């Protein structure tokens, strides 16, 4: 898979930046109003009862702020957060080590929770329900099970694939929040806030232009701002203007709707070779040289969101909106 400026997945260079930009409270957090308002109520109620917050599952496309919300939950509850990920927990013993290190009330954040192995999920069930850990000591006929009490804690799981979670695990979360793509106005506010942190002057129209091309995703908006800032410093006077922004994004091959060369390759491949479809996923994969799961999980969601692509039982179909975007005529049936 090509490295993508417009990928919602976190890249190495994003991590330090995201930490410095991360809001600390729900009041500072821009967007996701429905999830935010519900969490405000649940957190306040838990604090009034002097209880831990119910376990929380945050799901939705990458780059929308799941990690940020997990940290905010811990801050609002006044507790520490311990962070790990599904792929990092390889054995039940790894999970046991994490759980036994928690202090009362702590938040345990597991990113990519859908990638937990089923055997590890089974260790997690009693921990989530009864705050206890069942471990097996010894092997064979002499093996015995020992139950350890755990301090009350809140598990916050994050996933881009809620459907990949097993039903028993999903059912143990008391709070389920789907994170939605951001509006242009919300992203524009995020871009202006990030520019303040960078100590970079930015025109409001330039912030809007970056927001329009950021695919509804704050991580992409901040990444685009970083690249446009480079052009402003080298090709301009340091101020991010509309002119500099349009020039930079054109050179970066990010079009007015936030589509890049990979999106163009996928859509034009279906249009030019298969008359717009329907065409099967495996055929599209072979045509553009990308793995089918990458197309399905990474490239297609935004194209579906903006109505440029349809998934049908017969295959993928490019819509009239995409033809219009490319200035092409729709083929007659």
UniProtKB/Swiss-Prot annotation:
Its main location: cytoplasm. Signal peptide: none annotated. It is an enzyme of class 3 (hydrolase). Residues 183-253 are annotated as: Small ATPAse domain (RuvB-S). Mg(2+) binds at residue 67. Pfam families: AAA_lid_4, RuvB_C, RuvB_N. Residues 256-333 are annotated as: Head domain (RuvB-H). One of its GO terms (biological process) is DNA recombination. Coiled coil: none annotated. It catalyses: ATP + H2O = ADP + phosphate + H(+). ATP binds at residues 21-22, 63, 66-68, 129-131, 172, 182, 219. Its EC number is 3.6.4.-. The RuvA-RuvB-RuvC complex processes Holliday junction (HJ) DNA during genetic recombination and DNA repair, while the RuvA-RuvB complex plays an important role in the rescue of blocked DNA replication forks via replication fork reversal (RFR). RuvA specifically binds to HJ cruciform DNA, conferring on it an open structure. The RuvB hexamer acts as an ATP-dependent pump, pulling dsDNA into and through the RuvAB complex. RuvB forms 2 homohexamers on either side of HJ DNA bound by 1 or 2 RuvA tetramers; 4 subunits per hexamer contact DNA at a time. This is Holliday junction branch migration complex subunit RuvB. The gene is ruvB.
């Amino acid at each position: 898979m090509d490295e993508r400026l417009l990928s919602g997945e976190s890249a190495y260079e994003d991590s330090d930046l995201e930490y410095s930009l991360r809001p600390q409270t729900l009041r500072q957090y821009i967007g996701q109003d429905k999830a935010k308002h519900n969490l405000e109520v649940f957190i306040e109620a838990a604090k009034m009862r002097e209880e831990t917050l119910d376990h929380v599952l945050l799901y939705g496309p990458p780059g929308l702020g799941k990690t940020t919300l997990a940290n905010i939950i811990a801050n609002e509850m006044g507790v520490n957060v311990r962070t790990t990920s599904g792929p990092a927990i390889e054995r039940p013993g790894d999970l046991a080590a994490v759980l036994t290190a928690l202090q009362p009330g702590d938040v345990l954040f597991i990113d990519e929770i859908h990638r937990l192995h089923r055997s590890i999920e089974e260790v997690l069930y009693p921990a989530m329900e009864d705050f206890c850990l069942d471990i097996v000591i010894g092997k064979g006929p002499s093996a015995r099970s020992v139950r350890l009490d755990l301090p009350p804690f809140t598990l916050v799981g994050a996933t881009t694939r809620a459907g990949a979670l097993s039903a028993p695990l999903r059912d143990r979360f008391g709070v389920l929040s789907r994170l939605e793509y951001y509006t242009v106005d919300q992203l524009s506010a995020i871009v202006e806030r990030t520019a303040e942190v960078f100590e970079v002057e930015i025109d409001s129209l330039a912030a809007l232009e970056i927001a329009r091309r950021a695919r509804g995703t704050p991580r992409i908006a901040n990444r685009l701002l970083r690249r446009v800032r480079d052009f402003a410093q080298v090709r301009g006077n340091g101020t991010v203007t509309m002119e500099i922004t349009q020039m930079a994004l054109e050179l970066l091959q990010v079009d007015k709707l936030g589509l890049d060369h990979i999106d163009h390759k996928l859509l034009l491949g279906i249009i030019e070779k298969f008359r717009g479809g329907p065409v099967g996923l495996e055929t599209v994969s072979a045509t553009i040289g990308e793995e089918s799961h990458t197309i399905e999980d990474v490239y297609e969601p935004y194209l579906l969101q903006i109505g440029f692509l349809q998934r049908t039982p017969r295959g993928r179909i490019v819509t009239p909106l995409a033809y219009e975007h490319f200035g092409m005529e729709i083929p007659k049936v």
